[in-house]
């Protein structure tokens, strides 16, 4: 089936699709707090979703393109589930968030199929994959249209992989007691086996969102990167997130000794946001398999255990947490109780001495991850390093922080 036909088949109207903001039923919706963070973007009045412009630009989307798509959504006069929120247009049509971003992705998909130069075609496919991923954002369970956009994002990424200079392999990992999961191994030029970083992403992202991390930071150092979707999204959608948050990544980590392109004696884990929960858990449970663990803006305790902090983050992020836990219609109190069980301190891990070297980067006044969170991680390690990243200028400091983390990982792997 051609890519164009796949798009038509997937998005063919069958019934009234649920609108994203209605999928998680909040019992006590409060006022939307004003939030701005490097990794998550910011709350913008009249938008349900956090607008994560920095990360979208970092992934290769042009700022003007973002504004153009947003403008189309704002200008729509179609019915909305909440007349105050632009991105709540009902149904797959003009003005709907998923429709507009997927339509933009199809423009790049078309360019990719018509481009004779393989590398350029690969870049266009990658661009399309990123746009399809934004269409599916924030990847809530039960969002039929978003899940279809995810399928197109993964398909476009596979097409990009065949054309881009980096060597990429799709690897299936069997998981006892359930469906296998698929990861992407990104390899730098040269002969393997390579030292490898296991990437653990945030709960509101797909594994394909981190290609820039490999291309700009790890590949130049001769380091491979293995990605895996977090439980309940993408290729891991058949798995619910549980208190054993590192289950899928742990099985992938154990399987690395059987993968010829990976030097399984030189492996590190890197966690963004809740992905740090997975990475730090692995630092304790699999210290013999990991040379190092790095975190950025980690979510390992404070947000999971402090009701005040939970009240200070945007509605969309709480919806993401509830969705990952399979608690779409739970009371706020029930959600709070359940979230506390995911704290690595509550689980009795963090605070105990850990032999794995751990580094954690943080921003001052980060609503999702206070400085104490990173201090808790680094002080628990026998070889801990704390990295403060100044907020402004945002893009340059984000890049500088990633370079510092890459340097630290490289020293421990190479």
Curated annotation (Swiss-Prot):
Keywords per UniProt: Hydrolase, Serine esterase
EC code: 3.1.1.1
GO molecular function, one term: carboxylesterase activity
Reaction(s) the record says it catalyses: a carboxylic ester + H2O = an alcohol + a carboxylate + H(+)
Pfam families reported in the protein's UniProt record: FrsA-like (PF06500)
InterPro entries: AB_hydrolase_fold (IPR029058), FrsA (IPR043423), FrsA-like (IPR010520), FrsA_esterase (IPR050261)
Cysteines engaged in disulfide bonds, as pairs: none
Similarity comment text for this entry: Belongs to the FrsA family.
Role this protein plays: Catalyzes the hydrolysis of esters.
Protein name, entry field: Esterase FrsA
């Amino acid at each position: 089936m051609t890519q164009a036909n796949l798009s038509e088949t997937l998005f063919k109207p069958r019934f009234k699709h649920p609108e994203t903001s209605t999928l998680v039923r909040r019992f006590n919706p409060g006022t939307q707090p004003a939030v701005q963070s490097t990794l998550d973007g910011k709350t913008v009045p009249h938008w349900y979703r956090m607008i994560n412009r920095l990360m979208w630009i970092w992934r290769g989307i042009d700022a003007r393109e973002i504004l153009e798509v947003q403008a189309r959504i704002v200008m729509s006069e179609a019915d909305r589930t909440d007349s105050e929120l632009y991105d709540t247009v009902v149904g797959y049509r003009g003005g709907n968030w998923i429709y507009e971003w997927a339509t933009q992705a199809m423009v790049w998909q078309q360019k990719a199929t018509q481009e004779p130069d393989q590398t350029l075609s690969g870049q266009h496919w990658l661009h399309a994959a990123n746009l399809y991923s934004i269409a599916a954002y924030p990847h809530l369970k039960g969002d039929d249209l978003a899940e279809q956009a995810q399928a197109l994002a993964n398909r476009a990424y596979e097409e990009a992989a065949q054309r881009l200079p980096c060597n990429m392999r799709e690897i299936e990992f069997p998981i006892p007691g359930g469906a296998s999961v698929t990861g992407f191994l990104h390899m730098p030029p040269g002969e393997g086996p390579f030292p490898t970083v296991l990437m653990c992403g945030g709960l509101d992202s797909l594994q394909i969102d981190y290609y820039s991390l490999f291309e700009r930071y790890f590949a130049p150092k001769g380091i491979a990167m293995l990605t895996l979707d977090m439980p309940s999204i993408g290729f891991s959608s058949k798995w619910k997130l549980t208190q054993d948050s590192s289950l899928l990544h742990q099985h992938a980590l154990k399987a690395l000794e059987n993968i010829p392109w990976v030097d399984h004696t030189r492996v590190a884990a890197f966690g963004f946001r809740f992905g740090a929960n997975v990475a730090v858990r692995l630092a304790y449970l699999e210290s013999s398999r990991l040379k190092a663990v790095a975190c950025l803006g980690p979510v390992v305790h404070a947000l999971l255990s402090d009701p005040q902090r939970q009240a200070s983050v945007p509605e969309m992020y709480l919806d993401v947490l509830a969705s990952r836990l399979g608690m779409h219609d739970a009371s706020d109190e029930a959600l709070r109780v359940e979230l506390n069980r995911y704290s690595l301190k509550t689980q009795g891990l963090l605070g105990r001495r850990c032999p794995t070297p751990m580094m954690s980067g943080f921003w001052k006044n980060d609503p999702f991850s206070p400085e104490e969170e990173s201090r808790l991680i680094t002080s628990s390690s026998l070889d801990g390093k704390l990295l403060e990243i100044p907020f402004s200028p945002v893009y340059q400091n984000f890049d500088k922080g990633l370079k510092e983390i890459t340097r630290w990982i490289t020293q421990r792997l190479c």
